[in-house]
């Protein structure tokens, strides 16, 4: 009898040791483990929250389980107290973690419109982030906006003179060109003078070449002009030859006189 009691005590001690190593059992026997942080939006309601408190009354809960179930997070209370239709607020912006069920507009529409709206406000005010109010969002939902507004943005051309009043103060291209040319001329007067001198020299060369070509053509065309030029050339050649012959004669006479004087001495 003593040996049987000892073996039973030994077995009970082994079972108690194994149970101490095992994790605590879940309070819900009819399904997998459940946490209040992962409550889906479709199940949220007063009945679902009441079911969280129900369970096995005889089961002893640990301190961590009671803390998770009794102290619910603040966002869960807000979702439970929130009406079915969300109340729109002018300065409220939902974060990316909020569920899709509480947003009326599709995500793609909102993203595309924010891109288009940001570009519009960049041109006007210089701010890329723009928070839309309830009136503006309602008006935009009523208007048919395309899913890809980038094609329409590419067609828009921003012209600076469109923002000017209708008093006739529009820029003139000719006046702008004249002003720029006058500024450059006043700033570089020395270079303009040099270029004018170069142009005048080139013009004079062109005039000389044209006159020479005209005279040559006239001489070739007129036979009388040819004969006159030939006679003038012959006269000049004869005069030059006579002058040379006179010079030679004078030099020869001078040499002869020198030789006579040398012989007399």
From Swiss-Prot:
Residues 180-191 have a biased composition (Low complexity). Residues 1-11, 170-179 have a biased composition (Polar residues). Transmembrane segments: none annotated. Residues 1-33, 158-197, 219-244 are annotated as: Disordered. It comes from the Eukaryota. One of its GO terms (molecular function) is DNA-binding transcription factor activity. One of its GO terms (cellular component) is nucleus. This is Uncharacterized protein At4g06598. It comes from Arabidopsis thaliana.
């Amino acid at each position: 009898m003593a040996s049987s009691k000892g073996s039973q005590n030994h077995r009970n001690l082994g079972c108690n040791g194994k149970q101490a190593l095992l994790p605590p059992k879940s309070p819900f026997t009819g399904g997998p483990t459940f946490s209040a942080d992962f409550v889906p939006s479709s199940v949220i309601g007063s009945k679902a929250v009441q079911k969280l408190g129900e369970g096995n009354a005889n089961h002893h809960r640990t301190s961590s389980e009671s803390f998770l179930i009794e102290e619910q997070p603040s966002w869960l209370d807000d979702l439970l107290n929130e009406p079915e239709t969300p109340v729109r607020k002018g300065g409220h912006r939902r974060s990316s973690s909020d569920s899709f069920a509480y947003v009326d507009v599709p995500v793609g529409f909102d993203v595309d419109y924010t891109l288009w709206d940001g570009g519009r406000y960049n041109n006007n005010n210089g701010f890329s982030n723009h928070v839309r109010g309830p009136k503006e969002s309602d008006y935009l939902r009523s208007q048919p906006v395309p899913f890809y507004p980038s094609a329409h943005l590419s067609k828009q051309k921003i012209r600076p003179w469109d923002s000017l009043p209708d008093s006739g103060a529009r820029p003139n291209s000719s006046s702008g060109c004249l002003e720029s040319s006058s500024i450059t001329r006043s700033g570089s007067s020395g270079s303009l003078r040099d270029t004018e001198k170069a142009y005048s020299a080139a013009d004079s060369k062109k005039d000389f070449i044209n006159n020479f070509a005209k005279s040559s053509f006239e001489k070739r065309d007129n036979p009388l002009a040819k004969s006159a030029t030939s006679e003038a050339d012959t006269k000049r050649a004869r005069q030059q030859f006579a002058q040379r012959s006179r010079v030679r004669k004078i030099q020869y006479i001078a040499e002869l006189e020198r030789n006579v004087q040398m012989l007399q001495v």
